[in-house]
Amino acid sequence: MHLSSDEVILWQSGFLKLNLTIVTTWALMLLLAGGSALITRRLSTGITISRWQSMLEIIVTMAHRQISEVGLQKPEKYLPFIAALFLFIATANLCTVIPGYEPPTGSLSTTAALALSVFIAVPLFGIAESSLVGYLKTYAEPTPIMLPFNIVGELTRTMALAVRLFGNMMSGDMILVILLTISPLVFPVLMNILGLLTGMVQAYIFSILATVYIAAATRTR
């Protein structure tokens, strides 16, 4: 038994390694890219649209409203990034129904990469909204003495994003293994259902936290 898919090495040459996390991550990206191309290839801008497009527009509208309720004034600017985070995490967790599949979100390297993308995106959005000088001034608010504390806070919340997602996914897997040894017939079915629900919740929480951080960086001063 291994704790993370990082430990499953599929190919190695010197210091170069290809582990299961990398393979599943790229497979998910190809799945999402291919699915997006298939779903959007027949979208219409006319008055008459298909039921499928109508459902997609409802979902996008709901996401748009959710982002605006968090505090972002121009949700359409941030929707692609936030939606990409949610779709990747949600799809990674939903695919656990496939036998033998191990979600990359159970790897700290993947969750750290997702958190790093948020860490980079937040100042970029902030600078785009209020200029470089205006954004940097926020680190000295409300007084300059808060500068080191604000910098540390920026770093620690990024670490918290990565560890929170990794810990929640890892704990779910460990509980499933424990219950499987107790009752191999009943508990696995219930835990798989609960695991799917938990995976969706974790994707939602991660996306909402990213939205909150972006809203804080782009708020009007």
UniProtKB/Swiss-Prot annotation:
It comes from Chlorobaculum tepidum (strain ATCC 49652 / DSM 12025 / NBRC 103806 / TLS). One of its GO terms (cellular component) is proton-transporting ATP synthase complex. PROSITE patterns: ATPASE_A (PS00449). The keyword Lipid metabolism does not apply. One of its GO terms (molecular function) is proton-transporting ATP synthase activity, rotational mechanism. The lineage of its organism: Bacteria, Pseudomonadati, Chlorobiota, Chlorobiia, Chlorobiales. Key component of the proton channel; it plays a direct role in the translocation of protons across the membrane. It is found in: Cell inner membrane. This is ATP synthase subunit a 1. The keyword Transmembrane helix applies.
